Amino acid sequence: MGRRFAAVAIVALGFGARAQDAAARPLVTRVHGIATGIAACWHPPHDDDQVTVRTSFTREGAVIGEPRIVFVQSSGGRADDAALADSMKAAMRDCTPLHFSARLGSAIAGQVLDIRFIGPTRATIVAPP
């Protein structure tokens, strides 16, 4: 009985921490905020690396499925492209779910978005495919 209670308590604490993390994230009210929210968590190997990722989100700001890297250009050369793609996948995993406003979530839920990142400070939503 004691072990079961301890296991339940640990799981509950984990869910509480995750909910607290989501609440601490800034509210995203515009489409461009999606790109800047993810860019804030991205740590590319070089400052002028470029990545375009294709993804979609739920109303609540969670990624639907696996984000697809559609373009990678590392300033370190082709040998660094895999590490660059991995850094973007890590940012998508670690930075989501984003905290969408109800209005934004309703507008973009399920829509495919291409997000272009140029270094850690420039990010834009490009025309959907």
Residue spans of the language-model regions?
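Hydrophobic h-region of N-terminal signal peptides that target proteins for export
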Residues: 8-19
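Conserved "boundary/linchpin" sites in short secondary-structure elements
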Residues: 36-43, 56-75, 89-129
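Short, small/polar residue-rich loop motifs at catalytic or cofactor-binding pockets
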Residues: 46-51
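Cleaved targeting-peptide boundary
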Residues: 19-29
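An anionic, turn-rich surface loop/hairpin at beta-sheet edges
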Residues: 78-84
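Short hydrophobic/aromatic-rich motifs at helix boundaries and adjacent loops
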Residues: 9, 25, 60-64
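Bacterial N-terminal signal peptides that target proteins for export
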Residues: 1-6
